[in-house]
UniProtKB/Swiss-Prot annotation:
One of its GO terms (cellular component) is cytoplasm. Belongs to the GID8 family. Core component of the CTLH E3 ubiquitin-protein ligase complex that mediates ubiquitination and subsequent proteasomal degradation of target proteins. Acts as a positive regulator of Wnt signaling pathway by promoting beta-catenin (CTNNB1) nuclear accumulation. Its main location: cytoplasm. Residues 60-117 form the CTLH domain. This is Glucose-induced degradation protein 8 homolog. It comes from Nematostella vectensis (Starlet sea anemone). PROSITE patterns: CTLH (PS50897), LISH (PS50896). It is found in: Cytoplasm; Nucleus. Residues 22-54 form the LisH domain. The lineage of its organism: Eukaryota, Metazoa, Cnidaria, Anthozoa, Hexacorallia.
Length: 225
């Protein structure tokens, strides 16, 4: 295909429709994602439905699952405690992760409208970290800015109160636990998606007009421009 060629949506979708993927390979990608991210119940259900064997014993996920669930429920104190019991070096050797866990704990106090406790926690926790917290000053300022709004969810930094923020921190902690256990920290599916984004950037850089995937989660495409 020459770089000047324009591919319309119908032609592009027809080409995609002709691609053939083995069901077993797709199932392995899904199972790898569920195991790596610590979704034991979903992995067990998928094993039964698809016959795909997990990439690791599912019982080995229990500690990671409990820690992830604690973060996703907003119980950061419990998540930190369980992580330290599992392996104290995980947080001792990862200042960025520790900051994000404490930041999330602050966010949960703000979510609960416990302003006095939030200010007290921020003054105590982040002043103790001293120079280290200075590295993350912008993130801390954005979090503290939530206190200035009657409805912080509707503020410019309201995304910090979304459940996706908990998910982000849970995934960061999950990856750190995997790394400490000398296991791969990212599911293969994430690498496939990165490759997709890279390929789209390459095509755009070569001025090829094509229907770009605009929303990966839903698989929706833009019209060619």
């Amino acid at each position: 295909m020459s770089f000047a060629e324009e591919v319309n949506r119908e032609e592009w979708m027809e080409k995609i429709g002709k691609l053939r993927f083995q069901r077993a390979e797709m199932n392995r990608l899904i199972m790898d994602y569920l195991v790596t991210e610590g979704y034991k119940e979903a992995a067990e259900k998928f094993r039964i439905e698809s016959g795909t064997q997990p990439t690791a014993p599912l019982d080995s996920l229990d500690d990671r699952i409990k820690i992830r669930e604690a973060v996703q429920k907003g119980d950061l104190e419990q998540a930190v405690s369980m992580t330290n019991k599992l392996n104290p070096d995980i947080l001792d050797s990862n200042q960025q992760l520790y900051f994000h866990l404490q930041q999330q704990r602050l966010i949960e106090l703000i979510r609960e409208k416990d302003i006095e406790a939030a200010v007290e926690f921020a003054q105590g926790q982040f002043s103790e970290q001293g120079q280290e917290s200075g590295r993350y000053l912008e993130e801390l300022e954005q979090t503290m800015a939530l206190l200035a709004f009657d409805n912080p969810e509707e503020s410019p930094f309201g995304d910090l109160l979304h459940t996706s923020q908990r998910q982000k921190v849970a995934s960061e902690l999950n990856a750190a636990i995997l790394e400490a256990e000398h296991k791969k920290t990212q599911p293969k599916l994430a690498n496939v998606l990165k490759l997709l984004l890279w390929a789209q950037d390459e095509l755009e850089g070569k001025k090829v007009k094509f229907p770009k995937m605009a929303e990966i989660a839903s698989g929706t495409f833009e019209e060619s421009r």
